[in-house]
């Protein structure tokens, strides 16, 4: 590897010397690789002073590393990174991005490391390639897809160029998708349509978004796509004639008013036409006949003047004027929109914007790097600031969402929902999803404003908090001064923004966690005290930390919370504390202390007179069944000699087995007598079932049919309607217990039945 690198460095030095010599002999005109001519030509249009030599070097490196690799299409692999870089160049990306695009697959697919990349092309290129590489490591499954999208948002928030390269990568893959198996095509197309294309749209990359949508449409719905294409081709000639008539009329009106402008027809996109047919329920002719034009001017004043000219030529439709210049959509899209009644009584959609606004609309946040190298950063600065604010918001969401799928659902909603803009009392613009309420507005301003919101005014009038906002509304919210103020559970019924939903859900989850933590701590202390166990030895910070780690909880508070929520029983935790820090004398005292008097009498009446246990083959030794694991005939068992001289009998899978076997000299062999002489033994089963009317009746019927007595029962139901029921039965052996478990599992709505200890 080192010899190859030294050879590479030597050849690079020769090439560099040759290049300098060529410049001196040819007046600084260097002959480039003809394969790169289209890429370099496009790049120079946006960045005339760009250093093209680094692009040549990047291409040479990528070509060498991918040498011999063939794509599914049969083309050399180098055609893919070259195409990705060309797409990035077409939207005006900077030289660094193009270098990263050329090299974006080298680290993942070859032995070229990030260190090599940093050494050869610098840290910035390496960071971009690393970001793209991490996005490409996609596992299978829905959860993996959601986690990948989450990673994409994190990478994008750190440097949006990572997403630009990823989108360009996806666009070229979609263009060549026909060479993949149909199922892979469908999977990629659906992800593109649901996430990648909306992300491109949200970042203002309209031209890329349209193509991604149409390519996905062709793969997912080929028959519908072909029909739309045919209809468009059939209607195109008459539509083009009508459009030319309008453009000529508008151009003439602008010229008469001394407004220098370019008037263009707006193209119709196949997926957009299909969506309007589905969503609006309208015929193809109605949608396709809706003609649109775009007026491009030199400055903002002429945008408004151009709309004035259009309104003088045609009758404006009421309520259809939208000013996205003073209140940009998504923080990046700026334009004036209006709809008028055109020739022949057909609606005409008109947009007016400056040339810079048009470029921003087509290429979005990517335009920032064009301005950065040509006009200074100020032209695209506000768009970048607003877009970065949106990406920071997404970053907050992904941190707050414990479940990646929850984050993906929120992202999909935010990307696909229509937006409104409202104003704060100070005149600041706040973008919200359509149907948002004052509560959504409050959370958009600040989390604490949302939590403490108690009232609102819209346009100076007091309104209910569930009132729906409209674009242009001026919103003022009133907050409580109470430090403990919080949201209402009822808000979850009407808020629509992902941020508001997440913040409200988190608040109640935190409130529940605190309640569970206190309840869990109290429950554990109560079990220890009730059992007469040494509090000073068991209930310490170090002992609790040990048990929390053993039970796979991150800390002691998490363990207390789990006890309080019912995820684990306090008795089970005490059993583990005893196994690690207690001794047999503590255990015996605890069993007596926590056993009800009536049960203790019944237990002694059976176990001491006829436990059915042979100790070392003899029935004469006093033995009693351990309450910690409740063995019944048929269980594998062992004996442990107590300090009082008796023998406690445990199941071999008892939770205390590890602690007891630390004193092997006290372990004795025990076995079940062949005849139990009619004795019964306690066994506890826990079942989980869908909560429904008649569940307990059904379970009772099954138990009665098995002729088994119930000595204790308790139950609780979770928020997701899962009922957990615990029964203690008097059974003769494991055979009867197993039959009972089978019949309970077969009961309608029962998910699972399993055996537990008396407290575990």
Swiss-Prot record:
Domain of life: Bacteria
Pathway assignment: Purine metabolism; ppGpp biosynthesis; ppGpp from GTP: step 1/2
InterPro entries per record: ACT-like_dom_sf, ACT_dom, Beta-grasp_dom_sf, HD/PDEase_dom, HD_domain, NT_sf, RelA/Spo_fam, RelA/SpoT_AH_RIS
Pfam families: ACT_4, HD_4, RelA_AH_RIS, RelA_SpoT, TGS
Boundaries of every HD domain copy: 77-174
Residues in TGS domain copies: 418-479
Gene3D superfamilies (UniProt xref): 3.10.20.30, 3.30.70.260, Beta Polymerase, domain 2 (3.30.460.10), Hypothetical protein af1432 (1.10.3210.10)
GO biological process, one term: guanosine tetraphosphate biosynthetic process
Keywords linked to the UniProt accession: ATP-binding, GTP-binding, Kinase, Nucleotide-binding, Transferase
GO CC field: plasma membrane
GO molecular function per UniProt: ATP binding; GTP binding; GTP diphosphokinase activity; kinase activity
EC number per UniProt: 2.7.6.5
Domain ACT: 684-758
Reactions catalysed, as given in the entry: GTP + ATP = guanosine 3'-diphosphate 5'-triphosphate + AMP
EC supergroup of this enzyme: transferase
Biological role stated in the UniProt entry: In eubacteria ppGpp (guanosine 3'-diphosphate 5'-diphosphate) is a mediator of the stringent response that coordinates a variety of cellular activities in response to changes in nutritional abundance. This enzyme catalyzes the formation of pppGpp which is then hydrolyzed to form ppGpp. It also has (p)ppGpp-degrading activities.
PANTHER family: GTP PYROPHOSPHOKINASE, GUANOSINE-3',5'-BIS DIPHOSPHATE 3'-PYROPHOSPHOHYDROLASE
Recorded family membership: Belongs to the RelA/SpoT family.
Protein name: GTP pyrophosphokinase
Source species: Corynebacterium glutamicum (strain ATCC 13032 / DSM 20300 / JCM 1318 / BCRC 11384 / CCUG 27702 / LMG 3730 / NBRC 12168 / NCIMB 10025 / NRRL B-2784 / 534)
């Amino acid at each position: 590897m080192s010899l190859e690198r030294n050879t590479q460095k030597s050849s690079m030095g020769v090439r560099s010397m040759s290049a300098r010599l060529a410049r001196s002999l040819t007046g600084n005109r260097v002959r480039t690789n003809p394969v790169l001519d289209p890429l370099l030509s496009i790049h120079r249009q946006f960045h005339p002073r760009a250093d093209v030599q680094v692009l040549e070097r990047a291409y040479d490196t990528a070509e060498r590393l991918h040498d011999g690799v063939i794509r599914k299409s049969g083309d050399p692999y180098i055609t893919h990174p070259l195409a990705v870089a060309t797409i990035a160049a077409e939207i005006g990306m900077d030289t660094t991005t193009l270098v990263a695009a050329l090299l974006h697959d080298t680290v993942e697919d070859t032995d070229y490391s990030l260190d090599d990349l940093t050494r050869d092309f610098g840290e910035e290129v390496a960071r971009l390639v690393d970001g793209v590489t991490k996005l490409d490591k996609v596992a299978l499954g829905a959860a993996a897809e959601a986690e990948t999208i989450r990673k994409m948002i994190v990478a994008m928030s750190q440097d949006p160029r990572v997403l630009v390269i990823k989108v360009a990568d996806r666009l070229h893959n979609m263009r060549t998708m026909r060479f993949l198996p149909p199922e892979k095509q469908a999977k990629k197309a659906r992800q593109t349509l649901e996430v990648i294309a909306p992300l491109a749209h949200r970042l203002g990359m309209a031209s890329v978004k349209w193509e991604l949508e149409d390519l996905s449409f062709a793969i997912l719905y080929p028959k519908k796509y072909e029909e739309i294409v045919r209809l468009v081709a059939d209607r195109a000639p008459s539509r083009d004639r009508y459009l030319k008539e309008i453009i000529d009329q508008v151009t003439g009106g602008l010229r008469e008013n001394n407004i220098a402008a370019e008037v263009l027809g707006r193209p119709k996109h196949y997926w957009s036409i299909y969506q309007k047919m589905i969503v609006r329920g309208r015929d193809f002719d109605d949608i396709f006949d809706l003609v649109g034009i775009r007026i491009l001017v030199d400055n903002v004043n002429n945008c408004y003047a151009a709309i004035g000219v259009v309104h003088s030529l045609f009758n404006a439709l009421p309520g259809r004027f939208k000013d996205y210049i003073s209140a940009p959509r998504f923080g990046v899209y700026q334009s004036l929109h209006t709809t008028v009644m055109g020739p022949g009584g057909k609606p005409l959609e008109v947009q007016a914007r400056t040339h810079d606004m048009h470029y921003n609309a087509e290429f979005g946040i990517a335009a920032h790097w064009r301005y950065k190298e040509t006009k200074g950063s100020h032209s695209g600065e506000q768009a970048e600031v607003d877009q970065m604010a949106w990406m920071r918001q997404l970053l907050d969401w992904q941190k707050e969402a414990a479940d990646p799928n929850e984050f993906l659902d929120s992202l999909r909603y935010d990307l696909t929902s229509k937006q409104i803009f409202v104003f704060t009392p100070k005149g600041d613009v706040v973008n919200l999803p359509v149907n948002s309420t004052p509560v959504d507005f409050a959370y958009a301003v600040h989390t604490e404003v949302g939590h403490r919101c108690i009232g609102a005014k819209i346009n100076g009038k007091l309104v209910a908090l569930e009132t729906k906002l409209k674009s242009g509304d001026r919103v003022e919210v009133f907050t409580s001064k109470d430090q403990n103020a919080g949201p209402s559970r009822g808000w979850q019924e009407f808020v629509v923004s992902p941020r508001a939903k997440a913040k409200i859900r988190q608040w109640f989850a935190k409130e529940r966690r605190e309640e569970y933590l206190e309840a869990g701590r109290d429950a554990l202390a109560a079990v220890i005290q009730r059992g007469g166990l040494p509090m000073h030895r068991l209930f310490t910070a170090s002992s609790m930390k040990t048990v929390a780690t053993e039970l796979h909880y991150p800390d002691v508070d998490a363990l207390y919370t789990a006890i309080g929520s019912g995820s684990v029983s306090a008795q089970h935790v005490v059993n583990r504390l005893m196994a690690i820090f207690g001794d047999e004398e503590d255990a015996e005292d605890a069993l007596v202390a926590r056993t009800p008097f009536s049960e203790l009498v019944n237990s002694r009446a059976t176990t001491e007179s006829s436990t059915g246990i042979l100790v070392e083959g003899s029935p004469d030794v006093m033995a009693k069944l351990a309450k910690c694991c409740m063995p019944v005939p048929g269980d594998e068992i062992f004996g442990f000699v107590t300090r009082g001289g008796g023998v406690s009998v445990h199941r071999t899978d008892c939770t205390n087995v590890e602690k007891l076997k630390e004193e092997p000299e006290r372990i004795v062999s025990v076995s079940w007598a062949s005849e139990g002489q009619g004795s019964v033994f306690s066994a506890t089963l826990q079942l989980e079932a869908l909560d429904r009317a008649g569940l307990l009746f059904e379970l009772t019927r099954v138990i009665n049919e098995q002729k088994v007595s119930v000595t204790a029962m308790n139950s609780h139901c979770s928020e997701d309607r899962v009922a957990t029921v615990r029964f203690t039965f008097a059974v003769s052996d494991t055979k009867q217990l197993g039959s009972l478990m089978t019949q309970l599992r077969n009961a309608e709505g029962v998910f699972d039945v399993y055996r537990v200890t008396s407290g575990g």
